[in-house]
Swiss-Prot record:
Belongs to the universal ribosomal protein uL22 family. One of its GO terms (cellular component) is cytosolic large ribosomal subunit. The gene is rplV. HAMAP family: Ribosomal_uL22_B. Coiled coil: none annotated. The lineage of its organism: Bacteria, Pseudomonadati, Thermodesulfobacteriota, Desulfuromonadia, Geobacterales. This is Large ribosomal subunit protein uL22.
Amino acid sequence: MESSAKLSSVRLSPRKTRLVVDLVRGKGIQTALNTLRFSPQPSAKLISKLLSSAVANAEQKGCSDVDKLFVKTIFVDGGAVLKRFTPRAMGRASKIRKPTSHITVVLAEKK
């Protein structure tokens, strides 16, 4: 049985978030949560909450043993980019890009 959770339009760079996501892909749920707890990256806290939400979804679906869950798939897609301008010298302006991410996680039971 599979359960999933999604997090949309998070104000994190997809490139930086993928570094953290790669740490937990394919691991058991407890190992993944412990890895994220000690990660210094800002995205680790949000991914940890997302994993906890996916575990709660699995319990609601009727998962018999939560300890058998593992991270089957987890991926980060780029979202909309917020564009801002900052004033520069001689009447010019420079673009500031503020990227967003969509994070999706799917948990499954080990057989």
